[in-house]
A protein has these predicted regions:
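Surface-exposed short loop/turn segments
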Residues: 21-25, 97-161, 185
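Sec-dependent bacterial lipoprotein signal peptides
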Residues: 1-20
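Short secondary-structure boundary motifs at beta->alpha junctions and helix caps
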Residues: 60-70, 134-148, 154-204
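Generic short beta-strand segments
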Residues: 48-52, 108-115, 121, 166-173
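Generic structural signal for residues in well-ordered beta-strands
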Residues: 89-91
Length: 226
């Protein structure tokens, strides 16, 4: 009998531990058209291994703990965005390898922040049988997320064309169910929209900057070397 109880205890503990395990959360980031003028310049995105493999663990209230492969998401999204501005985009692990590009882009690991709000739902659940009476008050969970993204853009001779930190607005997503997949999808959505927000800011700030326009004009006027 004791051995049976021990097996049950171990099984329950295993379920409890597995339920607390972080959930992998790919963001499936895709950049929409930015409606910017494409140049004839070439670009290289520097993605060191530490950035490419960056997978921060984020604990989000009311949702759980998530491992977000933000390095992979950043590379995908930045490549798509830069391809709308530059004739070609290469990706290298070290800046010294970017020897033939007009423009070099370096990024820091994005800072992800998110929190959930589920107090109303939990309060209504506590009412027991009266839950469905009070459900008319829309007991949805709301998740808020934002991203801060720092980056620098330099010319082929090292001249700075852009440097700064871009802060997304706070993006929100609500879900009326407590299903684990719905919670994860809500967190994925606010992270993805926030990352896209910051990349759009970076690209639009770059293409509007006088430094970039002047540099692009000089590179376009430079005679082609035989």
């Amino acid at each position: 009998m004791g051995s049976i109880l021990r097996i049950v205890q171990v099984g329950v503990l295993g379920v409890a531990v597995s339920s607390c395990a972080p959930t992998p959360l790919p963001l499936h980031t895709t950049m929409d058209p930015l409606k910017v003028r494409k140049t004839s310049l070439t670009a290289t995105l520097v993605m060191p291994e530490s950035l490419k493999n960056a997978t921060p663990r984020k604990e989000v209230s009311c949702a759980g703990t998530f491992d977000v492969p933000i390095g992979v998401e950043l590379e995908t999204a930045m490549t798509q965005a830069l391809s709308q501005v530059f004739e070609s985009v290469d990706v290298v692990e070290e800046k010294r390898l970017a020897t033939h590009s007009d423009v070099i882009i370096e990024m820091a690991i994005p800072d992800l922040q998110a929190e959930g709000h589920c107090t109303l739902r939990r309060t209504l659940y506590a009412t027991g049988p009266l839950y469905f009476v009070f459900a008319m008050f829309d007991p949805s969970d709301t998740y808020e997320g934002r991203v801060d993204l720092s980056g620098t853009v330099t010319g082929s001779a090292g001249q700075q064309l852009l440097a700064g930190t871009f802060n997304s607005k706070t993006h929100t997503k609500s879900t009326i169910t407590t299903d684990r997949l719905n919670r994860a999808f809500a967190v994925e959505t606010v992270f993805r929209e926030s990352l896209i927000d910051t990349i759009q800011q970076l690209i639009r700030t770059l293409v509007k900057s006088p430094e970039f326009h002047e540099y692009a004009d000089r590179r376009n006027a430079k005679p082609v070397q035989p």
